Amino acid sequence: MKQGIITKTCAVAAALAMGVSLAACGGGSSADSDKGHVYFMNNKSEVVDQYKQLAEMYTEKTGVQVDVQTGASGTYDATMSSELAKSNAPTMFNISGFDQFAKYQKYCEPLQDTEAYKLLTDDGKAYSYTIDGDSFTLPYAAEWYGIIYNKKIINDYASKDYAVIKSADDIKDYKTLKAVAESINEHKDDLGVDGAFATPGLDASDTYRFSAHMGRIPLYYEYKDMNTTFSKTIKGTYLDNYKDLFDLELETSPTDPSLVSSKTYDDVTSEFALGQVAFYPNGVWAYTQIKGNEVADDDLGMLPYYMGIKGEEESGPAGVYDASWAVNKNASDKDKQATLDFIKWMVTDDEAKKILSQDMGFSVPFTTFDGDEFQPDNPLTKIARSYAADGKIEVRSFTVPDQQWQDDVAAALIEYAQGTGDWSKVKSAYVDGWATEWNNNEESLGSVPQAQKFDQQG
């Protein structure tokens, strides 16, 4: 993590004492205290330099002081709690996940009537944490996940006499995906690959792909059936479909199922990046590890998570909007307005928009980011976004309980893959664990997500 330039010695000392890094201090003679003050508590250390640049640009342009403080890895919550208790508390801060929202909800200003909120896309509004009609957060980074594939391998396969498709465009459902994967695996020596799917790695570094991501696909369709966006209890209606895809990955990957728990995120990403497999379920963020290896940008594609669920053919990849901005309701009216003006500037000024989208790499869910020049230079992001342009419905990533639920699902999957446990343990971890962890969260956090009608999202 790169440290920003600090202009005040006392600020450095305070930062070191708290284990955080100050990314930027607006100030100097250009700042005008009569115009209010913006103090942003950031939790993304990888973009600290870009936030520093935005802060300096805005202060120079408006005379409003913008301070940015960045919590070091693992210390954000502790630093937030300390800073929010002070008289000069942050005027805006990051929220990542429902657990953080529940913890800091009492500090959050309702934003649904602000200009910035009104500039959110419909998907952005749907992911804003909302209670009783009040929307408290502004999602600022959209990402997508699905089944990434290598077009070169698929096209090579499609040219063979034994191919079951004419081109990658024929893969529009799970039945076809399964037939292609099994056929590629059968003819892998002729195709020069090690398998069809990348190893479903169940090392701790890789389990999120199967709990937090793939696990949300059956949840989406179950919630759709229930016409709700949240329930403390679920049935696992589509877990058999999840099992079908997981089994397909196990059966057509380069790794013996008994060994998948030893495969790390880096291991399985390398399988795809080096052109050893055709399919790799993951998100757009994987591009940073894929690029510069054996798979050209033009050879990257992305399918939705096909599992054989009725209606999935009309859906695109799943979207996730975990990173949001919130405004401190306890700030002075002057500072709140200065903060809202700063946020609006970030999402409307062309130079600021390029920093957010291209330099930070965010696909920002505001209507002002409608051109390619305001999207990240990431072919997977462009592909994922193209599904919506073609009329496909984005699968929404509904909130899962906590890390414990994810860990328990992963542990059951490991036993299943190794043959030491059966599928009923996975279902129990998914279904029974869901109720257990939401009850625990309600007791510890004091709230759970507020349910809305599924067909009235956004």
Report each predicted region and the residues it spans.
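Short, solvent-exposed loop/beta-turn-alpha elements that line the ligand-binding surface or hinge
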Residues: 112-123, 127, 166-170, 201-204, ...
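Glycine-centered hinge/linker elements that transmit conformational signals in sensory
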Residues: 181-182, 227-262
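Long, aromatic- and glycine/proline-rich binding clefts that accommodate carbohydrate-like moieties
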Residues: 303-305, 357-415, 443-458
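Hinge/lid segment of periplasmic solute-binding proteins
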Residues: 96-155, 209, 301-305, 375-376
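Extracytoplasmic/periplasmic substrate-recognition and gating elements
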Residues: 133, 293-361
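Short helix-initiation/N-cap motifs at beta->coil->alpha
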Residues: 70-79, 172-176, 259-274
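Conserved N-terminal structural module of periplasmic/extracytoplasmic solute-binding proteins
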Residues: 4, 11-14, 19-100, 116-119, ...
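Extracytoplasmic/periplasmic solute-binding protein
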Residues: 132-140, 145, 175-231, 277
